[in-house]
Amino acid sequence: NIFLLIFCLAGCGTSGTGTSESGTEQQESSSAAPNYYHKGKIFLPQADGKVTEEHEGVKLDLSHTDQGYFMAAYTGSADKLLIQVEGSDNIPYRYYFDPDGKYNALPLTAGDGSYAVTAYENVGDNRYAVVFTKIVDVTLENEVLPFLYSNQYVNFDENTKTVALAKKLTKGKTEIEAVQEVYEYVIKNIVYDDEKAATVKSGYLPNVDDTLKTK
């Protein structure tokens, strides 16, 4: 949870424009990687319905894979749905859904390339049966985007207390200063919850605001 908090605090901050040695403002170059940090923008995912797939109650919205995420929801008859996402790094990430029809964002953290998205329905106890597998080809607008958007594991919006704290900590700071400020805050104020780490159950979803309370 501490690492998720650092992610949210650093990614949701805002700061002033950097200056060069001559004191002039640094201009963004269209050919360089865009500076996505410290502009006060909250990166919230959307299910626009422009590119969709649906199989047996499993809904995928693939409208924004270039932004480093896709949306998924479940309205089927099983008690649980498991979606596994595996990219070119061959690391499978698993996400659990209730049959409530609510969309959640799933990040595409392995960069450009093909991702295998496999949906499994719970058929009893810890047993799951395959519903379908889809190959999703991804070309990111920028490699940092999968780590900036709110998603199922790092869930935040404009009303999240962590976002408000991030803006407060990083106001007027350069990018490097903002990272340092967040780092100092976390090591001084947040304690790793060893008991929770040892007893957490499958399907647990972190809450970044709850992490703020673990002092």
What are these regions (language model features)?
Residues 1-4:
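Sec-dependent signal peptide recognition
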Residues 8-11:
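C-terminal motif of bacterial Sec signal peptides marking the signal peptidase cleavage site
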Residues 13-176:
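N-terminal accessory/pre-domain segments preceding catalytic cores
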Residues 179:
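Short, well-ordered surface patches within globular domains
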Residues 182:
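Conserved hydrophobic/aromatic pocket- or pore-lining residues that grip, position, or stack substrates
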